Structure formats: C-alpha cells, structure tokens
Amino acid sequence: IEPDDYRTPPLGCDIQGGIADVAWFFQCADNRCITSHPNPDDSFWIRHFGKDALPYGHSWNLDALYENLSKESSSRRAVLFNHRDCYNPPCVICYQFQSTIHGVLDCTVTLRSSDVAKVLPQDVFMSDLILAWICRTNGFEPGKMTFNLANAHVFYQDMEYQEEFTIDFGD
C-alpha cells in the first residue's frame, strides 16, 4: 500500500501502525497466517492496547467478497466480516461494499462500539486502506465511506478539556 492509495488520514492516527495492521489483515484473511502479529512493534493495536489477540489470522471471507464483486459488481452480498467471531465480535463488525455504475466502490463500516477520541481516527484510516486495497485488486475507484457507530463513547481521561465538562455539585 502506497501513500497515493489512500486519502489524507484523520488527525491522531498512526499511519505506520495502520499500514502494518492492514497488511497483516490481508495476509491472514485466508487462514494461512499465524494468529500472532508478524511485526508487533509496528502494530497500532499492540502498541497502544497490548493486544495480540486481534481477529486476524482467521477468515474474514475475503475470497467470497472478491467472488461476489467479480460476478456481480453491484452485489448486495459484498460484505467482509469474521464469521468466527459472531458471538464475541470485535468493535468493527463488518465492511459492506456497494459499487456504482461508474466503477466506484463505496464502503459502509459498522462498529458495535467506538472509542471516538482514541480509536475512531485509526478505524477510519484502516477502513480507508481496506477500501483502497479492495478497489486496487478488483478494478474499482474508491468512493465514499459511511460509518455506523453504535455505543459511541469518549472516556473522561481522553477529553482534551476535562475542566469544561466537570460538574461540581457541591456538598
């Protein structure tokens, strides 16, 4: 993935970590990869959260997505999700792709939970990398991205202006 492949990343995202994690995602999407990250020092998730148990190394049905897009580019079944994690889903549940008649591929990302201050910029950047890769390998131009956030939250310690939001109820 080259810098020309993706749009300007949101402020606060880790470009190197995002590229490392998305490369691992695609390398492991067909179950032929070890489940531990090959470059943990580069991983955004491992460096920031200490997690080496990400939902990579398992099937995200990438082959089925490519098949759907190649058979019928306007397929409503062009969905990328990890069916093995349906009872313990990661924050990003799925990526749904929809193409236009002009060869543009849009992506809707559904998150069951979103840490807006710390993690959402990284999710946006990594989702854009995933869209760029899917487009490049399937002959589309990247289109718009839509994010559906459930349980969007900001942790108090991550707020830049905590004092402005502190309520003193007195005694």
Model-derived regions, located:
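Terminal, non-catalytic protein-protein interaction segments that mediate quaternary/complex assembly
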Residues: I1-D171
